[in-house]
């Protein structure tokens, strides 16, 4: 299983994105069927894609979800509480809502690998102190 941040979703769905090829190539290193994202990351990606290219790239992203190639993790109350705690802790970085959701999901799902174009994941540790394995 690989957690998927906003950046790769945008890059995969938008061929003009600067990270498109590196994200496409990164997919070859792990199973696409093992991608998991969060609602905040999916919403952020849909917003960015809508502004950048409208419905066509959004439709590509919907395809990943509807075809079962990417699952959307739904948080429990404990994760929401953890997200608030994380955003407070990293307010000087700052940590946004989508990143907080991914860190909290990683702790719940006990997963360290994150597919991201965001360098903040080199700063954020999991609650257990483990560092993320960042792809690409």
Region locations from a protein language model:
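Acidic, PIN/NYN-like endoribonuclease modules and their adjacent C-terminal/linker elements
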Residues: 1, 109-136
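Short, well-structured N-terminal submotif of metal-dependent ribonuclease cores
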Residues: 1-37, 50-61, 128-129
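Alpha-helix/helix-capping structural signal
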Residues: 7-8, 40, 78, 119-120
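Amphipathic alpha-helical segments within well-ordered protein domains
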Residues: 10, 43-46, 84
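Conserved beta-strand segments of alpha/beta enzyme cores
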Residues: 34, 71, 131-133
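Short glycine/serine- and small hydrophobic-enriched flexible loop segments
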Residues: 47-50, 107
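Active-site neighborhoods of divalent-metal-dependent phosphate/nucleic-acid chemistry enzymes
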Residues: 72-114, 119
